[in-house]
């Protein structure tokens, strides 16, 4: 196939945000998705946060790879240039993941959701964050017919 699936996401919020699951509802999935991840940070390659301790403080660690990365972090609003206000703001983060080596295949429809769960001083909680995402679909025309997909049950991880 000549199609490519890619996803980018930006998150602006305070405290840890990465416990929510990425869910891919494929070809008529209703209540339960065909693909359900283990956490937002896992989906973008963090596996165990994106931070390390430096002199007793938590420091975010950016990274870039060919297929996923975390290239952007800032707690400063670069658009604020005002004598009466500093540029502090809630942390902003930018991630990407290209589904080239692990395409999400579907015949009719695809719905992707992110569950917003975070951790604060009281433990896990449902969040309401500013999240923006972009998904790309590339396909050249004309093209040969795609091979039929296996049933969604046959595509489940083993």
Give, region by region, the residue ranges found by the protein language model.
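Intrinsic disorder/low-complexity detector
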Residues: 1, 27, 134, 139-158
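Structural helix-adjacent loops and short alpha-helical linkers that scaffold large soluble proteins
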Residues: 12-18, 29-32
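Single conserved hydrophobic/aromatic residue that forms the stacking wall/gate
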Residues: 1-7, 11
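Extended, compositionally biased non-globular segments
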Residues: 22-139
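Preference for intrinsically disordered or flexible, low-complexity segments
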Residues: 1, 14-17, 24, 88
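Serine/threonine-rich low-complexity intrinsically disordered regions
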Residues: 9, 74-76, 151
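Short linear, low-complexity motifs centered on an aromatic residue
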Residues: 20-22, 157
């Amino acid at each position: 196939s000549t199609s490519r699936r890619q996803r980018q996401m930006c998150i602006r919020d305070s405290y840890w945000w990465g416990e929510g699951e990425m869910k891919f509802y494929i070809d008529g999935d209703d209540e339960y998705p065909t693909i359900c991840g283990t956490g937002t940070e896992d989906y973008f390659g963090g596996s165990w946060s994106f931070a390390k301790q430096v002199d007793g403080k938590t420091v975010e660690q950016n990274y870039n790879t060919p297929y996923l990365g975390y290239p952007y972090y800032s707690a400063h609003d670069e658009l604020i240039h005002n004598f009466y206000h500093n540029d502090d703001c809630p942390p902003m983060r930018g991630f990407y993941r290209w589904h080239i080596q692990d395409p999400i295949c579907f015949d009719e429809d695809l719905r992707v959701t992110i569950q917003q769960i975070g951790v604060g001083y009281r433990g896990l909680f449902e969040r309401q964050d500013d999240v923006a995402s972009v998904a790309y679909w590339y396909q050249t025309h004309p093209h040969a017919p795609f091979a039929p997909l296996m049933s969604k049950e046959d595509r489940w991880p083993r």
